[in-house]
Amino acid sequence: MPTPLLPLLLRLLLSCLLLPAARLARQYLLPLLRRLARRLGSQDMREALLGCLLFILSQRHSPDAGEASRVDRLERRERLGPQK
């Protein structure tokens, strides 16, 4: 593809796909976010929700977390040597 066509193609994609999607998202998400902001008007409610969210996020483990912990255990065993 010739280089001068690339910016034109990107601009076309941006105007045809991304801008309408952003408009739709704004149209549907803004009222929801405003309603949520009204419900979370009190500082206590915001702190409680943030605490719950942080707890949930702290409980999530990546798929590699189990593998990494197994490797860590094996490395620890090698460093400590045979157990009596």
From Swiss-Prot:
<feature type="region of interest" description="Disordered">
    <location>
        <begin position="62"/>
        <end position="84"/>
    </location>
</feature>
<keyword id="KW-1003">Cell membrane</keyword>
<dbReference type="GO" id="GO:0045026">
    <property type="term" value="P:plasma membrane fusion"/>
</dbReference>
<comment type="function">
    <text>Myoblast-specific protein that mediates myoblast fusion, an essential step for the formation of multi-nucleated muscle fibers. Involved in membrane fusion downstream of the lipid mixing step mediated by MYMK. Acts by generating membrane stresses via its extracellular C-terminus, leading to drive fusion pore formation. Acts independently of MYMK. Involved in skeletal muscle regeneration in response to injury by mediating the fusion of satellite cells, a population of muscle stem cells, with injured myofibers.</text>
</comment>
<dbReference type="GO" id="GO:0060538">
    <property type="term" value="P:skeletal muscle organ development"/>
</dbReference>
<keyword id="KW-0812">Transmembrane</keyword>
<keyword id="KW-0472">Membrane</keyword>
<dbReference type="GO" id="GO:0014905">
    <property type="term" value="P:myoblast fusion involved in skeletal muscle regeneration"/>
</dbReference>
<keyword id="KW-1133">Transmembrane helix</keyword>
<protein>
    <recommendedName>
        <fullName>Protein myomixer</fullName>
    </recommendedName>
</protein>
<comment type="similarity">
    <text>Belongs to the MYMX family.</text>
</comment>
<dbReference type="GO" id="GO:0007520">
    <property type="term" value="P:myoblast fusion"/>
</dbReference>
<feature type="topological domain" description="Cytoplasmic">
    <location>
        <begin position="1"/>
        <end position="4"/>
    </location>
</feature>
<feature type="topological domain" description="Extracellular">
    <location>
        <begin position="26"/>
        <end position="84"/>
    </location>
</feature>
<dbReference type="GO" id="GO:0005789">
    <property type="term" value="C:endoplasmic reticulum membrane"/>
</dbReference>
<dbReference type="GO" id="GO:0005886">
    <property type="term" value="C:plasma membrane"/>
</dbReference>
<dbReference type="GO" id="GO:0043403">
    <property type="term" value="P:skeletal muscle tissue regeneration"/>
</dbReference>
<comment type="subunit">
    <text>Interacts with MYMK.</text>
</comment>
<keyword id="KW-0225">Disease variant</keyword>
<dbReference type="GO" id="GO:0000139">
    <property type="term" value="C:Golgi membrane"/>
</dbReference>
<feature type="transmembrane region" description="Helical">
    <location>
        <begin position="5"/>
        <end position="25"/>
    </location>
</feature>
<keyword id="KW-0517">Myogenesis</keyword>
<feature type="short sequence motif" description="AxLyCxL">
    <location>
        <begin position="48"/>
        <end position="57"/>
    </location>
</feature>
<dbReference type="Pfam" id="PF21950">
    <property type="entry name" value="MINION"/>
</dbReference>
<dbReference type="InterPro" id="IPR039014">
    <property type="entry name" value="Myomixer"/>
</dbReference>
